[in-house]
């Protein structure tokens, strides 16, 4: 009798969840995150840990010449090199159904990635990012303030803003090849338009005009959902919990 009772208890414990509970189980995604200019995958370590702790898979790509790969820096590194970095990581790790997230300059990169391998991408998410059309470069997109800034920090083929000049700190932002800002993006694959996309605009109410509002408007014009969160341009540092919640909501 005791044996039968124990067997029934075990049966209850291993019985499958009711259908309603199974439907409510959280979905887990594969995120590939592309950082912004001067940065590196290191800047997304905390976000990686938070998403991984919630059951997701996270791949942080560091673009050639930046972050822990700054020893490969060269003024010959261009936009295509950075697109190749992400494409090859996805292919070599055999990743599929990827939620591809690009922050800031990373928007240039992920646009090229979706054009190359749309079949591997579940959704592309632009996080306060550049959203280029074919034939555009970072520098060709109209923005007088950006053009003046780039001109003021260009040295010997690199972009060297003041905050990257302290070489005693690790990890840190590092100089980036100017060519990554001047190379033109060429989009040739119409299948990229079938990939779901979304835009996240971070904004500070006291900052107007917002330099990324034009890209949120582009996204809205394409019929994409646009999400807004109050934050500075670096939510991966300053508003981590809110960013993780929004990244989970978007897919």
Task: Set out the residue ranges of the language-model regions.
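Active-site nucleophile elbow and catalytic-triad environment of alpha/beta-hydrolase enzymes
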Residues: 171-190, 211
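Active-site loop/oxyanion-hole signature of alpha/beta-hydrolase fold enzymes
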Residues: 57, 65-98, 115-116, 141-143
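Conserved loop-alpha-helix segment in the C-terminal half of the alpha/beta-hydrolase fold
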Residues: 203-230, 234-237, 242, 247-250
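Flexible "cap/lid" loop of the alpha/beta hydrolase fold
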Residues: 75, 115, 119-121, 125-159, ...
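Residue in the alpha/beta-hydrolase core beta-strand immediately N-terminal to the catalytic nucleophile
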Residues: 62, 98-99, 122-125
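Bacterial N-terminal signal peptides
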Residues: 5-15
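Conserved HGGG/HGGXW glycine-rich cap/lid loop of the alpha/beta-hydrolase fold
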Residues: 26-68
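Gly/Ala-rich beta-loop-alpha elbow adjacent to hydrolase catalytic centers
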Residues: 101-102, 106, 110
